[in-house]
Amino acid sequence: MNYNDKSLSALKLGQKTEYKSEYDPTLLQPVPRKLNRDGLGITEQQPFDRGADVWTCYELSWLNENGLPQVAIADVAIDFRSENLIESKSFKLYLNSFNQTKFASLEQVEQTLAKDLSQCASGQVSVKVYKLSAYTQQPIVDFAGECIDEQDIQIDSYEFSNEHLASVAEGEVVEETLVSHLLKSNCLITSQPDWGSVQIHYVGKKLNREKLLRYLVSFREHNEFHEQCVERIFIDLIQFTQPEKLTVYARYTRRGGLDINPFRSNFESVPQNLRMARQ
């Protein structure tokens, strides 16, 4: 990736910013997906053909027509084919700009979010805004699958390397789902830690658990956005394991009232949003 690209140098991340409390869609800042995908060899014929960046927005508030504050939670799904991803701090600042703005209804807020986010992403964005009462019964769940974290192995290096995946696929062809809660990377711009869980569902030669875990742990000091990490994992698994089918799904912890949950697959549709223990 070209870290000096003007689209990155202009981002508000890591900079002192003024918080606006009146609606301002110009606060949203795009990051071209192409910046990272070119280096990974991802083209318009992506190795994944289904996916989205699913955001949960916990800090959403506006005024009704009488001036009474309203609060809600929004689910946002940005299609993987959009030209841009949306930078998270700008998303937070944009949501803050709703705080002192009057909207006629929850539906108007929903429509406004969808319009602005679609324009910033240059692609399809779906939005669903929920009253708090709709979230009170939402359970805390875990990823389905076999957790590979409880291995008795020695880790001496935390430098990213996909070479950990060399000969990771071995033996018979299986369909299985593997899970790790040890995914940690750093923000591309600020180097702040990003904590996540990752689920890998595949059909292919059985994956060696130790090698896969070492690979995932090697992200620990790696600087990339959430969405880019998931696409890198997908590409590396395709390259080293040649699976018949593959899904990579990560759910990251919340920052600034937002959590980001990228999903990429070549055979499964984007699942319904959920909530995990650290979210």
From Swiss-Prot:
GO process annotations (BP): queuosine biosynthetic process; tRNA modification
Biochemical pathway: tRNA modification; tRNA-queuosine biosynthesis
Coiled-coil ranges per UniProt: none
SUPFAM superfamilies in UniProt: Tetrahydrobiopterin biosynthesis enzymes-like
Active site: C187, D194
InterPro entries membership: GTP-CH-I_C/QueF, NADPH_dep_7-cyano-7-deazaG_red, QueF, QueF_N, QueF_type2
Superkingdom in the source lineage: Bacteria
MF (Gene Ontology): preQ1 synthase activity
Binding site for substrate: I86, E87, S88, H226, E227
GO annotation, cellular component aspect: cytoplasm
Subunit details: Homodimer.
Name by which UniProt lists this protein: NADPH-dependent 7-cyano-7-deazaguanine reductase
Gene name for this UniProt entry: queF
